[in-house]
Amino acid sequence: MSSLRQTPLTCSGHTRPVVFLAFSEINSDGIYYSISACKDGKPMLRQGDTGDWIGTFEGHKGAVWGVDVNKDATKAATGAADFSAKVWDALSGEEELTLQHKHIVKSVNFSNDNACIDCGGGAAGGDASRGGE
């Protein structure tokens, strides 16, 4: 049985439906984060246990369908209806990488070593640490 608190949270801020949530791993201090994909095109990073807003990743033109955050919550990835996937510095909110696709990107996932991302809905992926090389 998990010792984590299991209290439902209501997190305001999105103007359209949320379509997906992803969570970081729990760090040594017991802290974890969540990121939301939303039809408003503005994924939000939040404190996992409280739902407190940390920041919004702005740069997609259209609905964001897929999100992920790496294990230590230093990077975030987003996939959207604008045919792109993006990697963000989760600490500063700065966009680090954009991968263009031929179709809507509906899912993004960091690899277990956090070095690469896989993107669903198109056939591209990239090196999350070296600008897609």
Feature-to-residue mapping (PLM):
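Asp-box/WD-like beta-propeller blade repeats and closely related beta-sheet repeat scaffolds
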Residues: 93-115
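Beta-strand-rich domains and repeat architectures in extracellular enzymes and scaffolds
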Residues: 10-41
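WD40-repeat beta-propellers
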Residues: 43-47, 85-89, 108, 124-132
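A structural motif specific to WD40 beta-propellers
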Residues: 6-8, 52-55, 94-97
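WD40/WD-repeat beta-propeller blade N-cap
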Residues: 11-18, 58-64, 99-105
